[in-house]
Regions:
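Active-site microenvironments in enzyme catalytic cores
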Residues: 2-24, 36-37, 54, 90-279
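Gly/serine-rich nucleotide phosphate-binding loop at the start of the catalytic core
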Residues: 13, 17-37, 41, 51-101
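Compositionally biased, low-complexity flexible segments
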Residues: 45-49
Length: 279
């Protein structure tokens, strides 16, 4: 079971600038009597009633700079707008509102099984940005995708397909520069033997595989529950490096992410990539 406590933070975490989205709860002021809690100002019969007691204020864009916390929401509204500012780090002290935030307590309250929804907890650090992914980024990944394709998503056949692929192709493709003359010669040889694959095309060909992983705001935060399509019997968690990129293409930050992939679905057809990835 995932446990996030003070040991989840490296000792030097205060030495830098960090971006977070934090669910910040707040109290709902009793604008109307407790037994008639219609939305203030709405006199229509049957108007929607908010739940009684505390209500969440929603996600906040939070900056952590040199160990201090700042709320960037009043200045920018969203993390996306903040990262597209001219100087996102410089804006922290100029425009951020200093707040008292115990990051260790927020971390401890973040896993779904230990969460108190009336206390702050971490969300995914992005909001309005498109979530893109790069596939077949190294040799092992490329060979695994070829294996998926050759066993047609059948996990029981994966071991035999893996041995077959490695015997024929080998593991030394890392020395080949994608799109080079050597790569094109290898492609011709593989095509002649009937071993060419769309995954090899993006692995050693001229163009990389870059696709939309999911829609904005579909990502979930640390320790949150994830959804896996019930039709899949072979899914993989994939720890990956994630980059925060602004609209000008500048890399502003890095984090770790979990790219859950339905291997049996993707192995049936590359045209099912969206179904295999967006889950």
């Amino acid at each position: 079971m995932l446990r996030l406590d003070e040991h989840a933070l490296p000792a030097d975490w205060p030495n830098g600038a960090h971006v977070a989205r934090v669910h910040m709860p707040a109290e709902l002021p009793p604008a109307v009597p407790i037994n008639d809690r219609r939305i203030p100002g709405d006199r229509r019969a049957g108007a929607p009633r908010p739940p009684e007691g505390p209500l969440p204020a929603g996600p906040s864009a939070i900056a952590l700079l040199d160990g201090a916390a700042f709320d960037m929401t009043p200045a920018f509204g969203t993390v996306g707008a903040w990262l597209n500012a001219e100087d996102p780090v410089g804006a922290i002290r100029r425009k951020g509102v200093p707040i008292a935030l115990d990051l260790r307590a927020v971390l401890a309250n973040t896993p779904h099984h230990a969460r108190d929804p009336l206390k702050p907890y971490l969300l995914a650090p992005i909001d309005l940005q498109a979530v893109k992914a790069c596939g077949v980024t190294y040799v092992r990944s490329m060979l695994e995708r070829v294996i998926e394709e050759r066993c047609h998503g059948d996990a029981a056949r994966a071991a035999a397909a893996r041995a077959e692929v490695r015997e024929f192709i080998g593991d030394d493709l890392a020395a080949i520069r994608p799109g080079s003359a050597e790569a094109l010669r290898l492609k011709d040889a593989l095509v002649a033997k009937g071993w060419w694959s769309g995954y090899l095309e993006v692995g050693i060909g001229a163009d990389a595989e870059i696709f939309t992983k999911c829609q904005p705001m579909a990502a979930v935060g640390t320790g949150a529950r994830i959804g896996v399509h019930p039709a899949s019997q072979w899914s993989n968690p994939e720890p990956e490096a994630v980059l925060a990129v602004n609209a000008q293409g500048a890399i502003l930050g890095a984090m770790l992410g979990n790219d859950v992939n339905l291997r049996d679905v993707e192995g049936r057809s590359a045209l099912l990539l969206g179904r295999a990835k967006d889950n």
